[in-house]
Amino acid sequence: MFLEKLNSATSRIKSIEEKLQDINLIKNQKKYSKIIKEYTYLEKINTKKIEYENILNQINDNKTILEKEEQQEMKELIKQELIDLDKKKENLEHEIKILLLPQDENDSKNIIIEIRAGTGGEEAALFANNLYSMYIKYSEKKKWKTEIINFNETELGGFKEIIFEIKGKDVFKKLKYESGVHRVQRIPITESNGRLQTSAATVAVLPNIEETEIDINEKDLRIDVYRSSGAGGQHVNTTDSAVRITHLPTGIVVQCQNERSQHKNKDQAMKILRARLYEFEDSKKQEQRSNNRKQQVGSGDRSERIRTYNFPQNRITDHRANITLYKLEEFMQGELDQLLDPLTIELQEQTLKSNNI
């Protein structure tokens, strides 16, 4: 199965090369860019395939030499070389298998993250703020740029909701598995009896979609303007600068009040709407592809409980890959890679099995 998929992928290179010679293709930049991207991807696989075939040839040659070799010392050297080559072969096979996985066209995109307080009242809102701070610190370590789009703050400094953008290399690829329910266990600052409480916040990671990537009919939108308000419902603007956009066919509602001008708030709201509509359409496609099979692992389902943060034990557990670390304090300071890297590997392994690669 592995070799079949490998040969099938590399066999497409020739037909793509022929397409690229078509002069008319360059006139359609969107189509041209898509084909170039596929060609680059297949060339990468082909390079690995050549490397893999070379290793197989070396293994076969060494086995032939070993059968004929009479000197014990040389035999031991050849055996050691075969062990090394087998290890290289195994590592290369894994690299190729990962490349053969269905490609996520959004991996190179910037993202919009939406964090919402779930069960737990004020404590859930404070935890939502903690998660926001964690992602900001992680972004700083990665040299990514961040910008708040909209937020709804509580009186104690928590967030009922915060929406922000992260721009940088491989942002979606790195953070796409963060979507889901994040559960926290700790003693809240609002708890006078010192009892442990369980609260939750929901995270949604959406690829930032350009205007050209999705068609939105103006007739399908209802746009309302109102005065923006701060924590506790206090008015912070005397003009109708806040914007609420309703997409009538889907019922998706987006509102933005963070910017001072109505025009900027509308632009930001449209940015969120594009991302949510894209996610809405994509989830429908995934549902069709799964043929009614439950595919929760790494699906980014917002209702999926993915992680527990236990502060008294300094413990963080990711339930999808059964990974537990006793480094919660470091994790909340933006040291996410110590969990994200093994998580990605485990989810890739699970995907390989489900795709029979």
Swiss-Prot record:
Residues recorded as bearing N5-methylglutamine in the entry: Q234
Compartments where found: Cytoplasm
Post-translational modifications reported in the UniProt record: Methylated by PrmC. Methylation increases the termination efficiency of RF1.
Region Disordered, annotated ranges: 282-313
Keyword vocabulary terms for this entry: Cytoplasm, Methylation, Protein biosynthesis
Domain of life, source organism: Bacteria
Cellular component GO terms, alphabetical: cytoplasm
Molecular function as annotated in GO: translation release factor activity, codon specific
Matching Pfam families: PCRF, RF-1
Classification via InterPro entries: PCRF, Pep_chain_release_fac_I, Pep_chain_release_fac_I_sf, Prokaryotic/Mito_RF, RF-1
SUPFAM superfamilies: Release factor (SSF75620)
Family under the similarity heading: Belongs to the prokaryotic/mitochondrial release factor family.
Function: Peptide chain release factor 1 directs the termination of translation in response to the peptide chain termination codons UAG and UAA.
NCBIfam families reported for this sequence: prfA, PRK00591.1
Protein name: Peptide chain release factor 1
Organism whose genome encodes this protein: Borreliella afzelii (strain PKo)
Source lineage: Bacteria, Pseudomonadati, Spirochaetota, Spirochaetia, Spirochaetales
GN (gene name): prfA
